[in-house]
Regions:
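Aromatic/acidic polysaccharide-binding cleft in carbohydrate-active enzymes
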Residues: 332-436, 443
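Boundary/entry segment of secreted carbohydrate-active catalytic domains
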Residues: 53-96, 103, 108
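Substrate-binding cleft and catalytic face of glycoside hydrolase catalytic domains
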Residues: 98-297
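Carbohydrate-binding surface patches
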Residues: 430-480, 517-523
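C-terminal beta-strand-rich structural cap/linker in extracellular carbohydrate-active enzymes
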Residues: 503-525
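Bacterial Sec-dependent N-terminal signal peptides
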Residues: 29-57
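Glycoside hydrolase catalytic-domain groove-lining segments
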Residues: 287-342
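Solvent-exposed beta-hairpin/edge-strand motifs
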Residues: 475-494
């Protein structure tokens, strides 16, 4: 779900958020998906119950390594007519973005962010202005190596010149020609069309390319048609630039979707034959703001992790895919959005309610919990959806570049657990299942221990305060340390300046207190 990028193919969504207008492209929203969410949605309401006295918990960190920690953080943009002015109206936004240290920032151009054609028209004219208003600044930031997802084809390649309808030509040859021109534009000095030469301003090429967005819910595609699309586009793009790399699948998250789509793709006889560098998918904990906190947290272990494990088990059946990593290229708490007239896109007949859990103290427990579980499951990049948005989706505010608490959570995850550091995950245990632990041993002998408190205060809390925990952390097995620091992100953290680390004195057992939802990073040297 690209920021709530599903709606009936006859609906054009307009979501106005403080001056930013989201005009969603035409997307299919099959009935079975509606039913899946309906069956999963609960009836929690907004609540703010009073926390009880803290519960004492005990955590033990062993000196046993369980595997490498190689999970990078990243973020996303959706170049389109409702999004393209972000860098223009916020002159310092590239600095804010770069400070996150994102890896392979994701670009998902849709609607007028697709640089050829126009909705409802057979036009084949090119216009990169909206796409490049986001893409060019992103190419100047960080690793200068975004993942460009070819999310949609030009409108004239679909029935009725409508990008929400079926492809006219399911050989996908015309789509491949369009994709070749994108590679020419960004990597090989441009191309000529309609008496004009089109060439990217940036000296930085685009190495990473994603082949389509959420094929399991868009344009009536079948699993085998996606295989055909992938096998057609990738080799033809490689004829333009043999050095480029590819992300496959990028499925919308619903129960049973990996099981429905992966077998056809990985099949050694009838599946993918083109180059694949990563497999990718998307995860949201809910599509209904009424789902209570406990249900939203439970999705992580009960649904996200088993699906990642299924990805790896299916990939293992194909020698060409067996050693590849999985990237989670979209992730956030709630995928719902305003489908027009203030109504929910995911829950017909129900008013849309902005879910603040995407940017408050709930997120400070939820995202670290996700990060820890994905790190241990072998995910290699975790993408936030999306960078510039509102309080439900954004790390910063679209109109002001103002920071949200979600920004600081992702900022510190990237710094505490840098993916290229060579760190290893240490075995840990706890007597409290509501404390998520991730302990990392760095090559220099220092240790970072993350404790995320996702204890729910009351069973029906919806964006509640969480329940306080005093956690005794036993590090006696790790030897002695000479210095330490503690950094906490919770409801008391300044959104403007972020959390401030305090010095602590190392000892065999150290107590970390969290007064509700939040995360603490204990660093020992």
């Amino acid at each position: 779900m690209a920021g709530g990028s599903q709606a009936d193919s006859t609906v054009r969504d307009i979501l106005a958020t403080g001056g930013k207008v989201f005009m969603k492209a035409y997307w299919r929203f099959p009935l079975f998906i509606l039913l899946s969410f309906s069956a999963a949605c609960g009836g929690g309401s907004m609540s703010s119950s009073t926390p009880p006295p803290p519960v004492n918990a005990h955590v033990q960190i062993a000196n046993t390594v369980t595997g490498p920690l190689n999970l990078a953080m990243s973020t996303s943009f959706q170049p389109a007519e409702w999004d393209y002015q972000f860098f223009t109206i916020n002159s310092g936004a590239t600095t804010t973005l770069g400070n996150l240290q994102p890896q392979h920032i994701r670009l998902q151009g849709i609607s007028q962010g697709v640089p050829q054609g126009a909705a409802g028209s057979a036009s084949t004219a090119w216009d990169f202005n909206i796409l490049d208003a986001i893409t060019q600044p992103v190419l100047s930031v960080g690793d200068h190596s975004p993942e460009f997802q070819i999310a949609k084809a030009p409108p004239f390649l679909y029935s009725g010149d409508n990008s929400g309808d079926d492809f006219v030509d399911t050989s996908f040859q015309p789509f491949a020609t369009y994709a070749q021109n994108l590679v020419l534009y960004y990597n090989k000095g441009g191309f000529a069309a309609n008496g004009q030469t089109y060439v990217s301003e940036s000296p930085n090429p685009i190495t990473w390319w994603g082949i389509y967005n959420e094929p399991n819910i868009n344009n009536g595609l079948t699993p085998q048609q996606y295989v055909t699309m992938y096998n057609t586009l990738v080799p033809q793009m490689q004829t333009i630039d043999p050095s480029i790399k590819f992300a496959a699948m990028e499925l919308a998250y619903f129960s049973g979707q990996p099981q429905a789509w992966l077998p056809a793709f990985v099949d050694v006889n009838t599946g993918v034959t083109a180059r694949v560098d990563v497999m990718a998918t998307h995860f949201y904990s809910t599509c209904n703001q009424m789902d209570d906190d406990a249900k939203v947290f439970a999705m992580i272990k009960n649904n996200f992790v088993p699906d990642i494990q299924y990805f790896y088990s299916e990939m293992a059946t194909n020698p060409a895919l067996a050693a590849l990593p999985v990237w989670v290229t979209e992730n956030n708490v709630n995928a719902d959005f305003d489908a027009g007239n203030g109504m929910s896109a995911c829950n017909p007949g129900q008013p849309f309610v902005l879910d603040q859990r995407g940017s408050d103290a709930f997120f400070a427990a939820w995202r670290p919990y996700v990060f820890s579980q994905f790190a241990q499951a072998g995910v290699q990049v975790l993408y936030h959806w999306d960078f510039d948005a509102d309080a439900q989706f954004g790390e910063v505010d679209y109109n002001t570049d103002g920071l949200q608490l979600s920004y600081w959570v992702d900022y510190w995850l990237a710094r505490m657990f840098p993916s290229a550091s060579g760190a290893n995950i240490l075995q840990s245990s706890s007597d409290d299942p509501n404390i998520e632990i991730l302990a990392a041993l760095n090559p220099d002998g220092s240790v970072v221990i993350m404790l995320a408190n996702h204890a729910v205060n009351a069973p029906n809390d919806n964006n509640g305060p969480g329940a306080p925990r005093n956690t005794a952390v036993d590090v006696s097995a790790l030897g002695s340390f000479t210095s330490g620091s503690l950094l906490t992100i919770d409801t008391s953290t300044s959104v403007t300046s972020g959390p401030i680390a305090t010095s602590v004195t190392p000892s065999a057992s150290m107590t970390v207190s969290l007064n509700g939802y939040g995360v603490a990073f204990l660093t020992l040297k």
